[in-house]
Amino acid sequence: MIASTMDRAEVLRASTGDFPLQEVRVAVGGREWSVLHTDAVLSHADEARFLGDKKDRLPYGVALWPAAIALAHEVASRAGAFRGARVLELGAGTGLPGIVAASLGARVAQTDRQEVAMSVCRRNGERNGVEAIEYRLVDWAEWDDAERYDWILGSDILYGEPAHPHLRRIFESNLAPGGRVLLSDPFRAASLRLLERMEADGWRITMAKWSVGEDEARRAVGLFELAPPADANP
C-alpha cells in the first residue's frame, strides 16, 4: 500500500540548491512509514518521465524507487536475521531499507555519495522514530571502510557498469564470515550482467521476485541474495 500526502511541504536546503520534498506513506512489515523524497518513480512511465526531463535537476538518488520499497519488504520479512546484525546500506537514497533494518534491532550504517541523500536519510529516520543509524558520506571509488558486516544492502545500485569493480571490491572486503549481500533490482540489463559474472566466479545467488505499485503501474523487482565463494571469507 502506497499513499501520497502533501499536508505540509518541506524543502531540503543543500549546497547544490533547494529541493522540494514530498511525503509518501508506505506500508511495510505491519506498520506505515513516512518517507520524504523528491519524486516517486514507481512505474515504467514514471521512470521515462523522470529520466527524460532535462530541466529536472533533482538528484536521482533521493527519488523513491520501487527497488527500495521491495528491499524494505524483504528486510521486514527476515526480521529475525536482522536483529542484532551489523548492516551496511550502499547508495542509501531515501534510506527506507536501512531504516526498516534499524527498527528491527540491526546496527545500521547508511552510505551515499550525495550530501542531499544523507540529509534525507537522517530526516526519514527521525520522522519514523529510528535514530540509531550511522550516516557516512562516501564514494565507492574512494572506499576505505575496513569493517565487516553481516548484511550489505543495496536497492537499484547496479545500473552503472563503471561502478561494478568498486561494488565487487566492497562485497568481497566488507562481508563478515557467513555474511550476505541483499540487492533489489528491476532486472536492468547491466545489473544482470554483473550478477552473471559473479555467479561464474563462484558466488551463490538466489532470487525472489516482488511486485511494487498498483494495478497497471505495478513494477517487477528482483531480490537477489549473494553468498560469496566458500573461500572468500576464511
Predicted regions and their residues:
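S-adenosylmethionine-dependent methyltransferases
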Residues: 1-234
